[in-house]
């Protein structure tokens, strides 16, 4: 019908064009046809409806739909509303009107009659459209109801675990002789479990409807306080519902350790029972909420969980005030406040704290006895106004229609999502201001504590991308240490900055404490004590407990990202609350601090972020200490090496890029990332502190640590915003450890491009083949082809001599030699102090001082004496250059400071604008809340939701627009660009992309600029590895494939399923497509790696052995990088590999040798390194690095890959021709030593159960070196 009409219309248009005289007749013809079609349809519908009596009477009638109405609606919707038709109708009608006036061939009557018919039909169709809207609402409501019923049934049948739990609790209760004090608890519990406690009977909460599943039952029990006796309605307003003496902490006994009350609405709430942290209770601060430092802080909660936990149902005034971050003005003055007196409070601070506990805690903190009247002992947030309203206002009558609302409707998160028809974005997307809790446009949900998140809202593997993550991750119970004794204090969010403690569904703040105290003056000692405690000491500490989903790939990007660097990636769905621009701006725009600068990355004066994401590597992170002075955050003891990446400069003052510490190209960690990007990566992971400030926080640390899982390579790739491609100068794209961010202060490279001029290359011709900027097989003509390998290993251990001489493998002896040399150096140290002090102005030697002393030996090396002279000259040149660089660095720093100031001002402006947005939004929301309360449930979704949705989106857009502006130059574009630009910021990728395959992947994905790099890199790497069984390498690849392919937690590493999950899921939140892309990329890359390996193998067979020695060394190194120390910055690898291949692909034989040599060295070297480093004073990063490889983490290939993923780039040698590049003498020697250490550390393979039989088969060829 539609086609016929449109055909007629187009034909009429063609005819009408040439001769306007035919206009009215054609209009008449078309309108007549339209009306005839409509009439025919209506007639047919009426005829057919006689046969559809059953359908109409039994089904359609309940929606007040008739078959005829349905057909009319279809006509109106599909035909009459057709844009083409609508655009032409006015013209046609005007033609008909024209026909009534001009006496055409047809009589006037014909036109006027037709016009009247048309107008009647149009009116009828408009009525039909309106009627259908009403019917549609009814149909939607019915569908919602059916869906909730089905979901409820499905849950009841599926969740056997809950039934078991319930049975267990019942048995426990019935068998246990209750102490008299516990009788009340036991009875209540049994009652609740057995009768499912019809909600109207619940004396403690006004919530009338609840999902019947056991999860909800238990949640209700936990939330409403089991031991509270029923409170009668006539209870005196001031009478306290609970007994004054704190009841035994039943909940603490029975509930899983770190479950915090789901009701806790503040972004920073944590499972801290108040008694344990009385300091958390602030003093009366007017009407400021206690745990939310500002109204804004709570917004995310309402945004994320309004649909899950309508906070308006809380009984306690304090809870309402605190949790919602709004005061008695909302919700009818003190009504909600009064609720508290009507019934026992639901403690929001902790699942285990009862009101009595709160009172006790308050008493403690304020110096009052626990029994003090509640008005006095109130949490600090209660303002006098609150108390007045509480005392004066009568108990609110809960809106009746709410009580009557479908009692059988399932209130679980998923059902609610479906039933409301709202995209969670409406609720979740914008950080809705606190008022939203009251208005939850959908059916209010139970403010319950869900013990079984997989039931509520957790869709397996997150197949439904829009749903928020599970409330508590299944690994919740994995780590007791985190629970009672050392609960973390809520984050010290400062009102102005922490606008949005993102309460992302995935990162439930109410469960994963924001690890810092709420008080601005919070001192680091608390942090130290917390983290120095069992939490950090627990070797198997599972970050999953408090970061359950945070690290899962997308979450890190999504929630966490939204948390810390909202702008880094556009939130995939409104699943992530738009991050507050100021948080990201603070770090991001204010001063693009190079991520190397550790404390910058981790904190801004008062904001401390736990680098504990490092814990994710499951390495024991013992004392992670925070030095409050200078807000400098140091991880002083064993922290997974990856944290070391961030340590490029420890303090702001010394943020200069030190040559030895992090040579330009050295794999110092995060390499060219524009300063903030990694922060985005690990933000959440790192910081259970959702304080946005911490946007920068330990991102760098996380990407490497948590990502140790093999499967992570991919994910991490996609979840690390790709660095912006640095400009390239000549063939070298930004050296990996050179920050490509032109604004990064203290770097010696301008515009992220390494300026070859900076190193004079005059005498570099014959220098070591291990120099920074050239790769082992550098094609540079100045490298002597026939020279034997002069790498650190060969030089130091004397196996660079005539080819016939077999290399010594007496590692014990080597270690001894090293030890002796070290002691000698230490004796000589005083002499060299002057020289070092000169350098200190430019370079921060604190971390490698001893190492440099050790390597800067005047002692003749076993190789050639001419080289010593050359080094001396080189050193002299370098000293001069360093003075120049120092001046430049100072100038740059000055510029940075100015720019930072400017950015701060911009941020403040943006902050103000954001505040205005929030206020406006909150006002609108409050209005809507009031309206919503009056409306019936069925009307609410259809009418309020659209508005909320719109508001939410506006708000989200507003908040996001700000972040995004600052974001771009900071590298948030990196996320999307990642695959293409990966080679530009290789080191970052390496850090993030765990297994070497990741490196290959990076290379492959690299954009054209670096394709050659990546090509070389892969082949070389692969060649080095492929000829051998390289079970390690392939293990990694396999894990990687599995992890990515399945998106499953394939990780075998100790970090438990949680870390594994993080790696694989990161992309999900980052971008809708991020995940698939990353995974396919990683798979493709692995495949590429294999194919390239094959090609190169062929190629290398053909190649001559001229460079065998050198290449051998480098390949060895490179391979070592790929394997035991994978993270070496890709840039490094790429450059090296580039050179390696360029000069001459390596012969296969050599690779084998390398393998073997590598294999043998690995074990002893580990010991050597571990022995040496401590004595060197290389405490932090190197030790972590070495420890990582020691037995603790070498359980299986996966954990090895984990180790590999985290290795500190700083400690990986650069595969470059040291001779062909002008590099500081010190740097060169550092490289030598790194090589030695790296080779030694490779012994880890043995512990990984590598099949050594293959290596032994090649012994014969090995001597041929």
Curated annotation (Swiss-Prot):
Family (UniProt): Belongs to the FAM193 family.
Protein name: Protein FAM193A
Compositionally biased spans, kind Low complexity: 255-271, 772-781
The entry's keywords: Coiled coil, Phosphoprotein
Composition bias type Polar residues, residue spans: 953-973
Superkingdom of the source species: Eukaryota
Chain intervals with Acidic residues compositional bias: 355-365, 757-769
Signal peptide: none
Coiled-coil boundaries: 107-142, 873-932, 1093-1118
Protein source organism: Homo sapiens (Human)
Xref: InterPro entries: FAM193 (IPR029717), FAM193_C (IPR031802)
Pfam family, any one: FAM193_C
Biased composition (Basic residues): 868-877, 931-940, 1149-1159
Compositionally biased region (Basic and acidic residues): 893-905, 915-929
Modified residues (Phosphoserine): 293, 383, 642, 1129, 1144
Positions of region (Disordered): 247-272, 331-407, 553-586, 626-674, 750-785, 822-841, 859-881, 893-1163
């Amino acid at each position: 019908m539609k086609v016929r009409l449109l055909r007629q219309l187009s034909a009429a248009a063609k005819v009408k064009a040439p001769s306007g005289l035919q206009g009215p007749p054609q209009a008449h013809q078309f309108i007549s046809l339209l009306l005839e079609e409509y009439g025919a349809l209506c007639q047919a519908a009426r005829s057919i409806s006689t046969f559809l009596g059953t359908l109409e009477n039994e089904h359609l009638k309940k929606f007040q739909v008739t078959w005829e109405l349905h057909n009319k609606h279809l006509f109106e919707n599909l035909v009459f509303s057709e844009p083409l038709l609508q655009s032409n109708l006015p013209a046609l009608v005007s033609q008909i009107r024209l026909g009534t006036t001009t006496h055409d061939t047809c009589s006037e009557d014909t036109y006027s009659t037709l016009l009247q018919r048309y107008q009647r039909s149009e009116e009828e169709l408009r009525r039909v459209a309106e009627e259908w809207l009403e019917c549609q609402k009814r149909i939607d409501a019915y569908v919602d109801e059916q869906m909730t019923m089905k979901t409820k049934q499905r849950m009841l049948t599926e969740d056997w675990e809950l039934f078991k739990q319930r049975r267990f609790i019942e048995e426990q209760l019935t068998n246990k002789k209750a102490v008299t004090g516990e009788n009340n608890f036991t009875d209540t519990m049994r009652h609740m479990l057995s009768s499912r406690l019809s909600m109207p009977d619940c004396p403690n909460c006004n919530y009338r409807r609840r999902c019947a599943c056991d999860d909800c039952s238990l949640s209700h029990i936990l939330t409403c306080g089991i031991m509270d006796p029923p409170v009668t309605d006539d209870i005196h307003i001031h009478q306290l519902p609970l007994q004054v003496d704190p009841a035994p902490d039943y909940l603490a006994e029975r509930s899983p350790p770190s479950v915090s009350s789901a009701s806790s609405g503040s972004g920073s709430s944590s499972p801290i029972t108040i008694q344990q942290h009385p300091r958390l209770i602030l003093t009366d601060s007017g009407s400021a909420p206690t745990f939310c430092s500002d109204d804004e802080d709570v917004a995310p909660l309402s945004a994320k969980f309004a649909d899950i936990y309508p906070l308006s149902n809380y009984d306690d005034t304090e809870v309402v005030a605190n949790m919602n971050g709004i005061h008695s003005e909302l919700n009818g003055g003190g009504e909600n406040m009064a609720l508290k007196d009507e019934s026992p409070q639901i403690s929001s601070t902790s699942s285990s704290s009862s009101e009595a506990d709160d009172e006790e805690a308050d008493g403690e903190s304020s110096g009052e006895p626990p029994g003090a009247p509640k008005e006095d002992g109130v949490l600090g947030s209660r303002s006098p106004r609150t108390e007045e309203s509480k005392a004066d206002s009568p108990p609110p009558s809960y809106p009746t229609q709410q009580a009557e609302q479908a009692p059988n409707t399932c209130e679980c998160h998923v059902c609610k999502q479906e039933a409301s028809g709202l995209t969670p974005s409406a609720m979740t997307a914008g950080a809705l201001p606190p008022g939203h809790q009251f208005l939850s446009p959908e059916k209010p949900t139970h403010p319950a504590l869900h013990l079984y998140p997989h039931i509520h809202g957790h869709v397996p593997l997150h197949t439904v991308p829009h749903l928020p993550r599970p409330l508590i991750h299944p690994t919740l119970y994995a780590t007791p240490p985190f629970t009672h004794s050392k609960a973390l204090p809520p984050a010290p969010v400062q009102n102005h900055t922490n606008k949005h403690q993102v309460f992302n569904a995935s990162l439930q703040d109410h469960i994963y404490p924001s690890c810092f105290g709420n008080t601005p003056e919070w001192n680091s000692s608390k942090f130290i004590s917390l983290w120095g405690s069992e939490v950090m000491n627990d070797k198997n500490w599972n970050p999953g407990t408090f970061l359950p989903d945070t690290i899962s790939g997308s979450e890190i990007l999504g929630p966490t990202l939204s948390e810390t660097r909202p702008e880094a990636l556009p939130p995939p769905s409104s699943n992530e609350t738009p991050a507050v621009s100021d948080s990201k701006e603070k770090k991001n725009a204010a001063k693009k601090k190079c991520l190397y600068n550790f404390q910058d990355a981790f904190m801004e004066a008062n904001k401390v972020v736990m680098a504990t994401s490092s814990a994710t590597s499951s390495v024991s992170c013992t004392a992670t200490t925070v030095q409050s002075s200078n807000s400098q955050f140091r991880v002083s003891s064993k922290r997974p090496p990856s944290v070391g990446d961030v340590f490029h400069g420890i303090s702001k003052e010394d943020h200069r890029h030190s040559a030895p510490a992090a040579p330009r190209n050295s794999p110092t960690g995060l390499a060219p990332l524009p300063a903030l990007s990694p922060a985005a990566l690990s933000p959440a992971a790192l910081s259970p502190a959702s304080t946005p400030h911490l946007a920068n926080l330990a991102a760098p640390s996380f990407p490497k640590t948590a990502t140790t899982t093999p499967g992570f390579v991919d994910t991490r790739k996609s979840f690390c915003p790709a660095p912006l491609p640095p400009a390239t100068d000549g063939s070298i794209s930004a050296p990996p450890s050179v920050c490509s961010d032109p604004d990064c202060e203290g770097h010696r490279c301008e515009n992220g491009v390494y300026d070859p001029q900076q190193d004079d290359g005059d005498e570099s011709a014959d220098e070591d083949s291990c120099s920074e900027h050239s790769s082992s097989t550098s094609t540079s003509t100045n490298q002597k082809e026939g020279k034997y390998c002069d790498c650190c290993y060969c030089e130091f251990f004397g196996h660079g001599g005539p080819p016939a001489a077999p290399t010594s493998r007496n590692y014990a002896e080597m270690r001894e030699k090293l030890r002796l040399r070290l002691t000698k150096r230490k004796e000589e140290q005083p002499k060299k102090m002057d020289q070092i002090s000169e350098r200190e102005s430019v370079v921060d030697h604190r971390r490698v001082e001893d190492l440099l002393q050790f390597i800067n030996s005047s002692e003749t090396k076993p190789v050639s004496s001419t080289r010593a002279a050359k080094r001396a000259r080189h050193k002299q040149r370098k000293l001069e250059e360093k003075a120049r660089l120092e001046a430049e660095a100072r100038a740059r720093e000055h510029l940075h400071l100015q720019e930072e100031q400017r950015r701060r001002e911009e941020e403040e402006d943006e902050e103000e604008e954001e505040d205005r947005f929030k206020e406006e939004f909150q006002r609108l929301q409050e209005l809507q809340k009031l309206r919503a309360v009056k409306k019936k449930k069925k009307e609410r979704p259809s009418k309020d939701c659209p508005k909320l949705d719109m508001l939410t989106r506006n708000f989200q857009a507003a908040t996001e627009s700000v972040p995004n502006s600052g974001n771009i130059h900071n590298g948030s574009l990196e996320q999307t660009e990642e695959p293409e630009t990966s080679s530009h910021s290789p080191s970052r990728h390496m850090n993030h992309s765990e297994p070497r395959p990741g490196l290959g992947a990076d290379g492959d994905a690299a954009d054209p600029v670096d394709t050659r790099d990546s090509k070389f890199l892969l082949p070389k790497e692969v060649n080095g590895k492929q000829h051998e069984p390289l079970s390690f390498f392939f293990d990694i690849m396999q894990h990687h494939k599995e992890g990515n392919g399945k998106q499953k937690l394939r990780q075998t590493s100790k970090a438990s399923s949680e870390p594994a999950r993080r790696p694989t899921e990161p992309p999900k939140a980052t971008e809708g497509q991020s995940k698939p892309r990353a995974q396919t990329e990683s798979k493709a890359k692995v495949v590429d790696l294999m194919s390239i390996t094959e090609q190169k193998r062929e190629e290398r067979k053909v190649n001559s052995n001229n460079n065998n020695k050198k290449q051998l060394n480098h390949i060895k190194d490179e391979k070592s990088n790929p394997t035991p120390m994978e993270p070496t910055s890709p840039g490094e690898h790429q450059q090296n590999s580039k050179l390696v291949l360029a000069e001459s692909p390596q012969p296969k034989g050599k690779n084998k040798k390398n393998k073997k040599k590598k294999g043998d060295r690995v074990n002893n070297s580990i010991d050597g390194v571990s022995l040496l480093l401590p004595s060197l004073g290389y405490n932090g990063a190197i030790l972590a690095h070495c420890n990582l490889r020691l037995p603790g983490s070498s359980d299986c290939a996966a954990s090895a890959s984990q180790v590999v993923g985290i290795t500190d780039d700083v400690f990986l040698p650069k595969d470059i021709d040291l001779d062909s590049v002008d590099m500081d003498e010190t740097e060169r020697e550092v490289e030598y030593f790194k090589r030695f250490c790296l080779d030694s550390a490779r012994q880890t393979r043995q512990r990984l159960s590598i099949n050594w039989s293959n290596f032994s088969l090649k012994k014969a060829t090995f001597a041929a070196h």
